[in-house]
Amino acid sequence: DLCIFMDESHHYHADKSFDVINELRPIMGVELTATPQIQKGSRKIPFKNVVYEYSLAHALNDEKYVKVPVVFTRKDFRPEEYTPEQLDHEKLNDGLRLHEDTKSRLEVYARTFGRPVVKPFVLVVARDTDHSKEIMKYIKSNDFFNGYYADKVMEINSAQRGAEKDENIEQLLSLENPDNKIEVVIHVNMLKEGWDVTNIYTIVPLRASASETLTEQTIGRGLRLPYGERTGVDEVDRLSIVSHDKY
């Protein structure tokens, strides 16, 4: 008898996927997902036969297991007065200022309470590969914090191959290590799931999210707590998200 456990099971709901699974003739299928819904265009179709659900809303209400997501914007901000490139630059500047403040707060907390120092990093969501390269160029330039992040930024996308891809994967897997110098990760729809780190503290979305599922997956990257529980210090327990008008 065969029982199939399907992680990230929202991927299995296409007709061809079901055909393959049914050919195996399992007696039971158990699905695991943080986003129990199928997005079809603008429609969101919830899963049926849900045995147990623990939603982000429940986790936030329990005030124990995840960071508190907080959206940061500017008062009286008029995006129509900026070009798309200028808007990206403003959001990146706001995001990195939040990052520097968070980095200081984490260090103060660790030294005050004798805990390991957590090295935070920023996740930047780009529209496509060309956009990602433009962001990378800007962050490495002297126009961005006088070039401070030139050797502290990495880009991950599906076009990377060979040694470059291997090096980036190695960097991603060691981002929680204080010796890893990377503080900014730019990605194009590559890290929405299956990548678990606890030290994402700032997310800068520079693309409109295509679906509610994608939004939840992206934010979900940053909700894990580095100390395994909330500390009671707002800045240590917070995930900062720089506002996007369509995110």
Predicted regions and their residues:
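Inter-Walker segment of RecA-like/P-loop motor cores
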Residues: 1
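Post-DEXD/H (motif II) to motif III coupling segment of the RecA-like Helicase ATP-binding lobe
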Residues: 14-68
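Walker B catalytic acidic pair
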Residues: 7-8, 190
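Short glycine-/polar-rich loops that comprise or flank the Walker A/P-loop
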Residues: 25-28, 62-68, 150-151, 198-201, ...
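Conserved ATPase-coupling elements of RecA-like P-loop NTPase cores
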Residues: 9-19, 195-198
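Conserved RecA-like P-loop NTPase helicase motor core
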Residues: 159-247
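Conserved interdomain linker/interface between the two RecA-like ATPase lobes of SF2 helicase motors
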Residues: 48-138, 142-159
